[in-house]
Regions:
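Flexible, solvent-exposed loop/hinge segments and secondary-structure transition points
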Residues: 1-139
């Protein structure tokens, strides 16, 4: 299994931020979780609200812990609000079911981490996260 090491996490963050600048969106906070679901690296651009860390972490954590991207969690929340609310309670509020949390999968489709981004619209956050993940040759 491939591991998300510190340099890989930093690369994901930089490419995600570069994508955000290319798109000319609001400043973003990026959180990368490793194969254990632990924070490997995080970085917020200048001008980002400190609260954005919690949102980005909640997106990454929810995706990782539930084994589905936060867009899928968003769809599930629309259909099973009580279930997602209960899971969020179990996660001590660290599950944000809106797009912007993306799983990192290796070449065997195993989950090896996740990326969470907050700062702009959820769709734009997700685009930046995907760019970061794709930059390291993963999906």
């Amino acid at each position: 299994m491939k591991i998300i090491d510190m340099q890989t996490a930093k690369n994901v963050i930089q490419v995600s931020i570069d994508k955000a600048r290319e798109m000319n969106i609001n400043p973003i906070m990026v959180v990368v979780l490793d194969h254990r679901g632990a924070i490997k690296a995080c970085l917020g651009e200048e001008g980002i609200s400190p609260f954005r860390f919690k949102i980005a972490y909640g997106k990454a954590n929810g995706a990782y812990q539930m084994g589905m991207g936060s867009r899928a969690l968003f769809n599930r929340a629309e259909q099973q609000a009580y279930f997602v609310n209960a899971i969020n309670t179990l996660a001590d509020g660290n599950l944000i079911p809106v797009p912007g949390g993306v799983l990192i999968r290796d070449e065997n489709n195993a989950i090896i981490g996740s990326v969470g981004i907050s700062g702009d619209s959820s769709d734009n956050d997700e685009i930046a996260a995907v760019a970061g993940i794709e930059s390291i040759g993963l999906k």
